[in-house]
Amino acid sequence: MKMAFQQFVKGLANLDNIEKILQDVKKAASFSGTIRSNLIHMLDECGVHEAIHVKSSSSLFEEHRQLLHTTSIIKYPVFYQGKNYTGHHPIISHSSLLTTYAYHIFPQEFSQIEQPALIIPLGKTVEHVFDKLNREGKLPEHFYLYGFPHPSGANGHRKKQLLLQKESLLSTISAWAGR
């Protein structure tokens, strides 16, 4: 979040228009730092860069940013008991506010993504939300990389998880690339 604030202040100092500032903020803050490095490594490991005909998935955060849409099932920063909300406590379905964002607001945004896109739900909580939305018929016809490990440094098992899921992930990416 610090990166987002810094980019916003920089844009204001440059007297940029608000639309440009917000685009630059999203670009700078989307999976910044170690989480971005881990994500790029895993995307490259799965061949996403080859499927979109670029040298590395890192270009999705730079010169090929128009190919990437990042979002969240809960669109705004959430803090619980003074700490960043991890998606676990409280469980989304135990909070009317979180439930509204995950199951009502998010599907509206998600339905606007042009099909067929490659969708990468990051983490078990997101996969559980997607599973429920799918059962309710609220997920568009996209290609979903279920089982893709969360790239957070806190996920010390991500390399093992990627290895275990790699065959399935490669198959989905290949199907999406050959559409």
Label every PLM stretch briefly:
Residues 66, 141-143:
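A short helix-to-beta-strand connector/capping loop
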